[in-house]
Curated annotation (Swiss-Prot):
One GO CC term, this protein: small ribosomal subunit
Any Pfam family: Ribosomal_S20p
Gene Ontology molecular-function annotations: small ribosomal subunit rRNA binding; structural constituent of ribosome
Assigned keywords, A-Z: Ribonucleoprotein, Ribosomal protein, RNA-binding, rRNA-binding
Family: Belongs to the bacterial ribosomal protein bS20 family.
GO biological processes: translation
Gene assigned in the entry: rpsT
HAMAP family the UniProt entry points to: Ribosomal_bS20 (MF_00500)
Name recorded for this polypeptide: Small ribosomal subunit protein bS20
Function: Binds directly to 16S ribosomal RNA.
Superkingdom of the organism of origin: Bacteria
Region Disordered, annotated ranges: 1-25, 62-85
InterPro entries recorded: Ribosomal_bS20, Ribosomal_bS20_sf
SUPFAM superfamilies attached to this UniProt entry: Ribosomal protein S20
Length: 85
């Protein structure tokens, strides 16, 4: 554990950011899984709506640096293929 006051503050901020980032990534993964589940159940109408939400969450995660931009694009592309198939 840090002894210097500024290092203690940085450690606290780091932990807060880690928790926040984990929350955003979890929401993103849940949105993707929702789309995949709807596609599996042939509920394409709701899958398209869920895809819009998942796409926004993937873009936001990429913008914040939680995942790489190419990874977000790849996931969106694969989801779009499933929804439009």
């Amino acid at each position: 554990m840090a002894n210097i006051k500024s290092a203690i503050k940085r450690a606290k901020l780091s932990e807060e950011r880690r928790a926040h980032n984990a929350s955003i990534k979890s929401d993103m993964r849940s949105a993707v899984k929702t789309v995949e589940a709807l596609v599996t159940n042939n509920d394409l109408e709701n899958a398209k709506e869920a895809f819009k939400t998942a796409s926004k969450k993937l873009d936001k995660a990429a913008r914040k640096g939680l995942i790489h931009q190419n990874a977000a694009s790849r996931q969106k592309s694969r989801l779009a293929k499933q929804v439009n198939a």
